[in-house]
């Protein structure tokens, strides 16, 4: 065993997380924590890991950016033909993880996934810088390419194609919404006795809260 890795550890001492203090609505609680992450000026507080899997259970995970959230769910945008897009089309379940190290906090979210409306995808797509919109056309995401020059050549081609005209949203690009059935809030505590509060969605659409052992 490499002790330089095994001995890496940090004791968490900032604050606790109490059932009495949290909001009974997990979306309101998430908003509170997210606003605190923004106020702390964390780098990309909307960065999250999304884990997907094939129907036979082969998992994959990657970082994406949260672009919206409300009581309907948590929204991100992607190429629907990418690996995650294809896996979610076949198995529309996902897990999200936010890690805010400076606040010693983690949020885990799991639930089903659905596409957002065409109008929602359009609204976000047309708010993006022109080169980002072109990038949605240039990249056949997750496909093997021979070299970076392939991307640069395709960028030049699409820059020429859409010169002096509006860049349309590709049909294969848009938003996905994770509709949670569980949301867990984790607060680091001393001696690895962390606080974990799990919100679970009930059949009547209310949420119950349970404390989990760390």
Swiss-Prot record:
| GO MF annotation terms | FMN binding; pyridoxamine phosphate oxidase activity
Q: Which UniProt keywords apply?
A: Flavoprotein, FMN, Oxidoreductase, Pyridoxine biosynthesis
> What's the short name of a Pfam family annotated to this entry?
PNPOx_N
Biological process (GO) annotations held by this record are: pyridoxine biosynthetic process
Q: State its role.
A: Catalyzes the oxidation of either pyridoxine 5'-phosphate (PNP) or pyridoxamine 5'-phosphate (PMP) into pyridoxal 5'-phosphate (PLP).
- The protein, known as: Pyridoxine/pyridoxamine 5'-phosphate oxidase
Where on this chain does substrate bind?
9-12, 67, 124, 128, 132, 192-194
Q: How does it assemble?
A: Homodimer.
- In what pathway does it function? Cofactor metabolism; pyridoxal 5'-phosphate salvage; pyridoxal 5'-phosphate from pyridoxamine 5'-phosphate: step 1/1; Cofactor metabolism; pyridoxal 5'-phosphate salvage; pyridoxal 5'-phosphate from pyridoxine 5'-phosphate: step 1/1
Its domain of life reads Bacteria
What Enzyme Commission number(s) appear in the record? 1.4.3.5
InterPro entries to which the protein is assigned, alphabetical: Pyridox_Oxase, Pyridox_Oxase_CS, Pyridox_Oxase_N, Pyridoxamine_oxidase_dimer_C, Split_barrel_FMN-bd
Q: Where does FMN bind?
A: 62-67, 77-78, 83-84, 106, 141-142, 186, 196
- Could you say which residues form the signal peptide? none
Similarity section: Belongs to the pyridoxamine 5'-phosphate oxidase family.
Q: Which reaction does it catalyse?
A: pyridoxamine 5'-phosphate + O2 + H2O = pyridoxal 5'-phosphate + H2O2 + NH4(+); pyridoxine 5'-phosphate + O2 = pyridoxal 5'-phosphate + H2O2
**Record-linked PROSITE patterns:** PYRIDOX_OXIDASE
How many cofactor units bind, and how?
A: Binds 1 FMN per subunit.
Needed co-factor(s): FMN
The membrane spanning regions, by residue number, are none
């Amino acid at each position: 065993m490499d002790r330089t890795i095994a001995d890496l550890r940090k004791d968490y001492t900032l604050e606790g997380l109490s059932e009495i203090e949290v909001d009974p609505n997990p979306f309101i609680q998430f908003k509170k924590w997210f606003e605190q992450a923004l106020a702390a000026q964390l780098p990309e507080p909307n960065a999250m890991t999304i884990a997907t899997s094939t129907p036979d259970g082969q998992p994959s995970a990657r970082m994406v950016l949260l672009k919206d959230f409300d009581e309907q769910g948590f929204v991100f945008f992607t190429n629907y033909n990418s690996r995650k897009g294809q896996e979610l089309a076949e198995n529309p379940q996902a897990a999200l993880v936010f890690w805010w190290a400076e606040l010693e906090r983690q949020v885990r979210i799991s639930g089903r996934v659905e596409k957002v409306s065409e109008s929602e995808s359009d609204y976000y797509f047309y708010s993006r810088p022109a080169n980002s919109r072109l990038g949605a056309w240039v990249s056949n995401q997750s496909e093997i390419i021979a070299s970076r020059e392939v991307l640069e050549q395709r960028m030049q081609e699409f820059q020429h194609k859409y010169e002096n005209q509006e860049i349309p949203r590709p049909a294969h690009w848009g938003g996905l919404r994770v509709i949670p059935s569980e949301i867990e809030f984790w607060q680091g505590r001393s001696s690895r006795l962390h606080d974990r509060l799990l919100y679970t969605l009930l059949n009547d659409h209310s949420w119950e809260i349970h404390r989990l052992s760390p």
